[in-house]
Amino acid sequence: MSRPTVVLVHGAWADGTSWGPVITDLHQAGIPVIAAPIPLTTLDDDVDAVKRTIDRTEGPVVLAGHAYAGGVIGATSHPRIKALVYVVALAPDEGETVADVFYRDPPHPQAPELKPDDNGWIWLPHNAFPEAFAQHATADDHALLAAVQRPINVPCIQKPVPRPGWKEIPTWFLIAEEDRMINPDTQRFMAERIGARTHTHTVDPAPLISRPEVVTAILSEAVQSVATT
């Protein structure tokens, strides 16, 4: 079996650069890695974008998603996906929407108010990056995140998902104890429900930026598991 490739999927208000530190770590470890750019237009569009990225790879795939992208990776069906890694991510069950699980528990007091603009796109206020999205990251990180953020279209979070891959595929979950975007209680509920190999850390909602070594360690564990299966 060829060495697994890690396919990384960014969440809302981000692009592939959000995985930059993790990509560097994986590359230095000799683990093949590629980031999937998703349009954040509809759930189906995002799933199709991930499938196109997987088609560019060879061999088994460890598919990882951050935040909103948990809904995307669970809905992505591809014969070469051998592991799913939820990085502080949402994991709706069949018939649920991303919004259903996101709003399952009360929001953090510093969580931003999320509402669409006149065209149906949801943007993150710039002050939310240092206050809630990545409070442990640097000021330079916050400036970059705000500058490159990509809005998410409302239909992405309103469509019920199909039978998710986590029902059949080995799954890992990183819980962020200091998350101000997705309630940690919601994360614990999802991790238990999907039967994930769970890692809990005192990190913010964006550890792929603020604590990439934590994320890399979990991805490496998944890669090793697939490689020895």
Where are these regions (language model features)?
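Short, proline-enriched alpha-helix->beta-strand connector loops that line the catalytic pocket
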Residues: 4, 166-171, 194-196
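Gly/Ala-rich beta-loop-alpha elbow adjacent to hydrolase catalytic centers
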Residues: 64-73
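Conserved loop-alpha-helix segment in the C-terminal half of the alpha/beta-hydrolase fold
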Residues: 177-209, 221-222
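Flexible "cap/lid" loop of the alpha/beta hydrolase fold
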Residues: 80-126, 153-160, 190
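Active-site catalytic motif of lipid deacylating hydrolases and related acyltransferases
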Residues: 2-59
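Conserved alpha/beta-hydrolase catalytic His-Asp/Glu region
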Residues: 119-165
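Glycine-rich phosphate-binding loop signature in dinucleotide/nucleotide-binding domains
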Residues: 56-59, 167, 222-229
